[in-house]
């Protein structure tokens, strides 16, 4: 750990974009994996399309890409959602990325279905993945990219709801939401400016 009197060297030109979710095919198309879907959209936009590779030191799948001329690390932790903080902190340390250059895409139960909102800093809104990241980074000063999935119907348990796959009838809406989220990342990094 760095001495409080010494400023840690950071690479402020590099950004870390993290897509939260759970690993494995069982969870691939669930509401809880929307963050991972956003990373997939960003990968597909690379020319040629980029792919993830395992970064063994951090137990994370990553791709190093350029967006708007900036070096960007796209990442999907290989851990379950609730313990995402460790890999995110390790990646930030490995690449020397400050918290203010980290964007975390996640599923938002409180957000209207399909709504995308980017905000810097703030609370975790009860999201265990964000809680883990805040605890591991020791700060709230990272960006949150919420992807609205809405509340569960009736009395359905929210934990069961987020682990259900999106129905085929919502596929187009999910694709649009992921595209909107990727657009928001690109705007933040300077695409179109």
Curated annotation (Swiss-Prot):
The entry's keywords: Cytoplasm, Hydrolase, RNA-binding, tRNA-binding
E.C. no: 3.1.1.29
GO function term, MF aspect, one: tRNA binding
Disulfide bond sites: none
Cell compartments where the protein resides: Cytoplasm
Keyword Hydrolase: yes
Cellular-component GO terms for this entry: cytoplasm
Database matches in SUPFAM superfamilies: Peptidyl-tRNA hydrolase-like
Site (Discriminates between blocked and unblocked aminoacyl-tRNA): 22
Site (Stabilizes the basic form of H active site to accept a proton): 107
Binding site for tRNA: 27, 80, 82, 128
PROSITE patterns: PEPT_TRNA_HYDROL_2
Subunit record text: Monomer.
Similarity section: Belongs to the PTH family.
Protein name: Peptidyl-tRNA hydrolase 1
């Amino acid at each position: 750990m760095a001495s409080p009197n010494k400023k840690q060297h950071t690479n402020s030109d590099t950004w870390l974009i993290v897509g939260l979710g759970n690993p494995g095919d069982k969870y691939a198309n669930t509401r809880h994996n929307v963050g991972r879907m956003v990373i997939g959209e960003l990968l597909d936009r690379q020319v040629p399309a980029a792919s993830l590779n395992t970064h063994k030191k951090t137990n994370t799948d990553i791709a190093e890409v350029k967006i708007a001329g900036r070096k960007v690390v796209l990442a999907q932790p290989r851990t379950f959602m609730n313990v995402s903080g460790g890999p995110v902190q390790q990646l930030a340390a490995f690449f020397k990325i400050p918290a203010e250059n980290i964007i975390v895409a996640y599923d938002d139960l409180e957000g209207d279905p399909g709504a995308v909102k980017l905000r810097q800093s703030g609370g975790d809104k009860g999201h265990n993945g964000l809680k883990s990241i805040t605890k591991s980074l020791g700060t709230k000063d990272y960006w949150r990219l919420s992807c609205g999935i809405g509340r569960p119907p009736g009395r359905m348990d929210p934990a069961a709801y987020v682990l259900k796959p999106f129905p085929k009838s919502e596929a187009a809406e999910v694709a649009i939401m992921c595209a909107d989220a990727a657009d928001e990342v690109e705007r933040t990094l300077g695409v179109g400016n």
